[in-house]
């Protein structure tokens, strides 16, 4: 091996977690461990891919980002106890490789949520939106820090999250992170403080006058 690459194979630390080498697979679409745009569950196909990366000496693996609340159906991740049980049963096999697993948690898309024509109609027609709400609550998943135009359909405004909704989300991050820790996950990364996703305007550009 060329000596200039030797540093890639030395250990390093994030907090108190030591990672065996400097090879990292970052989060990317299609690798979410708990499913994506569907009711949350332990995704065996994603788990197979993640385990395969670890078996090929990737020191740190981050599955695709995971919203703390299901886009479809609106269930909070922490409410699915079976999913965390399945994760805990799988993780010992993953950890046999010596690799570490961090899970990327997200508050959601906010005004950057891509919406189609049906979703636009659900936003513009309150009765239609109410009918679809148990399956897809478009009003909630497009809500943002302030009343701002949707990134992809500026004719629709994202409503501001209520203070109660914000506190619910903060609580969900804490509960989900604790369940991940209890299952054996090595770390949590907070996703999406960029590109207008929900935590971006909350952190930087919101127009709110309270708290």
Language-model segment annotations:
Residues 205-211:
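Conserved small/polar residues in nucleotide/adenosyl-binding loops
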Residues 70, 110-113, 197-198:
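Generic structural signal for helix capping and beta-alpha/helix-loop junctions
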Residues 61-65, 101-105, 183-198:
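Short beta-strand segments at enzyme active-site cores
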Residues 90, 176, 205:
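Aromatic/hydrophobic pocket-lining residues that form π-stacking "cages" and hydrophobic walls in ligand
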Residues 79-81, 119-122, 207:
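Short, hinge-like loop/turn segments at secondary-structure boundaries
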Residues 36, 112-116, 200-201:
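Short, solvent-exposed loop/turn and secondary-structure capping segments
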Residues 100, 106-183:
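Non-globular sequence segments
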Residues 1-108, 158, 169:
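N-terminal capping/small domains of soluble enzymes
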